[in-house]
Every structure is written in C-alpha cells, then in structure tokens.
Amino acid sequence: MKSVAFFLMVLCALIIGSVSWETRASNLARKQSAVTNFDRAVVLHGVTLQKGEYLFVHDDAAMQRGEACTYVYEGNAPIAKKLVVSFHCVPIERAKAKQFIIRSVETSPGVTELQEFQFAGDTESHAVPTSIDQHLNVKK
C-alpha cells in the first residue's frame, strides 16, 4: 500500500512539473499584436509615424534573448517592407489593461512622443528605450 501511494505521489509530481514547463515554454514563445490608428503624427523612438494605421508586434522570445522585440509596421499586417521601426523595449508592470493602450507625452507644441504601449489583458507594459541607440533598427 505504501509503495502504491509513493508511486501516485511521484506520478502527480511529474505531471504537475511537466505542466509548469509547458506553460513557461509557451510564455517565452508568445507574440502579441494590436492595430491602432493615429489621428496625427507621433514620434516613436526617433521615427515620425504619420497619421494612419499601425501594427504593433511584441515577441517575448526575442526579448528574452536580448534582441529587438518590438516591431511597428505601417498598416495592419507584418509585411517586412512596411516595417517602420524595431527596438528592444523596457518592461514595466502596470494594472491589467482592458484594451490596447498607448501612453504618450507632448514634448513640444504639436509634437507627441509615444513612451509606452500595453496589450489588452496584460499587466506588462512595454516602454520605449530612452536612448536612440538601444537596439534600434529603423527603415526609412
């Protein structure tokens, strides 16, 4: 009887352990995306995004590797030739967002600078690095 109980405990531990590994692996591979529309020009990491629709994509696996993890495309699809800017974001814990949020500040009259963005349902916000040299890739 003791050996059966021990076997069941070991089996449960293995099952629980494997589930947590799968969850951790799926979080690393997670990609999030959202489309937003700007009604005026916005500066993002030194690049001016003109009025229009943009796709924001965040790749958690790239972030874990220290690579550029944020990609912003003109339009609503991740088309390479429509890539406007990519960079390695700075994660910030925030309250859970009910919708996709853009946080920006007016740096001078008529100039709005995007400082961070947060996906719906997430508690992690993605801040834009303050240095233009931090993991930047700009397509002009």
Named regions from a protein language model:
Residues 1-9:
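Bacterial N-terminal signal peptides that target proteins for export
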Residues 8-18:
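Bacterial N-terminal signal peptides
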Residues 24-43:
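Short acidic, Pro/Gly- and aromatic-enriched capping/linker segments at domain boundaries
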Residues 43-44, 73:
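A general beta-strand register signal
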